[in-house]
Amino acid sequence: MVVGGTLRDWEALGEQRWDDRVERLGEVADQAGASFLTLRAFEPGVEPVDLKWWERQVGSCHVIVDPCGDGRQRFAEAMQRLQADEPVNEATVAEALYEPADCEPDLIVVLGASTRLPPSLVWELAYSELVFHPMAWHELSPDDLVAAIADFARRERRFGGLDDES
């Protein structure tokens, strides 16, 4: 998952640059063996922008473009999608939040300072590894995703645990 920019930043990217970005980032994720790559806004921003959710298959990687910059809103919408006879538990909530992806993200690349967590993420922060890149949304390149994947590969996953030195 890559999280960055406001909805206004996303709109400013333009359709052609979006197509190129999805294709190129999808190729990197596909080469790394990822089944899914989700692109999500860091936050909604101050100006309302109406952008649509969309998806594309790039090789074996399903790329999801999710403009929801408010994690609480996304959580509420996921809860509304649950069937009335369905139990509300960690598994059903996770399934509703991640769909069409079939699992939680292993890696979240956050574009921005490491001192601020994205409000677009609520649920994902529990077990995903975060890699911060202090850059703006429009600066993101496939090489940045390659570097984040390499950083992730070097880590020892703690699944929400703390360093031994803490």
Protein language model annotation of sequence segments:
Residues 1-166:
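Flexible, compositionally biased loop and terminal segments
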